[in-house]
Amino acid sequence: MSDKIRTLQGRVISDKMEKSFTIAIARYVKHPIYGKFIRRTTKLHVHDENNEVQAGDVVTIRECAPISKSKSWTFVAVIERPKQA
């Protein structure tokens, strides 16, 4: 078994839950017939103990033991905050 801890980066799309938020992770896959690269999105629920993130932030998350039915990722750091107008 690998000792590496999986980490991912993505954009926060919802922070309306208590101690949790939803993140969208985009990836590009090649269409098997036409060869065009298509953007695919994965949505994950992430645990945030201190409620520090806001919608629009780009964050780093890491895999952890399951916290609930839908949460097995925990918040690590904010990489970028959206510019305020």
Swiss-Prot record:
GO molecular function per UniProt: rRNA binding; structural constituent of ribosome
Gene Ontology biological process terms, A to Z: translation
A GO CC annotation given for this chain: cytosolic small ribosomal subunit
Keywords: Ribonucleoprotein, Ribosomal protein, RNA-binding, rRNA-binding
UniProt cross-references to InterPro entries, sorted A to Z: NA-bd_OB-fold (IPR012340), Ribosomal_uS17 (IPR000266), Ribosomal_uS17_bact/chlr (IPR019984)
Gene3D superfamilies linked to this entry: Nucleic acid-binding proteins
HAMAP family hit by this protein: Ribosomal_uS17_B
SUBUNIT field: Part of the 30S ribosomal subunit.
Role according to the record: One of the primary rRNA binding proteins, it binds specifically to the 5'-end of 16S ribosomal RNA.
Family: Belongs to the universal ribosomal protein uS17 family.
Annotated protein name in UniProt: Small ribosomal subunit protein uS17
Organism per entry: Pseudoalteromonas translucida (strain TAC 125)
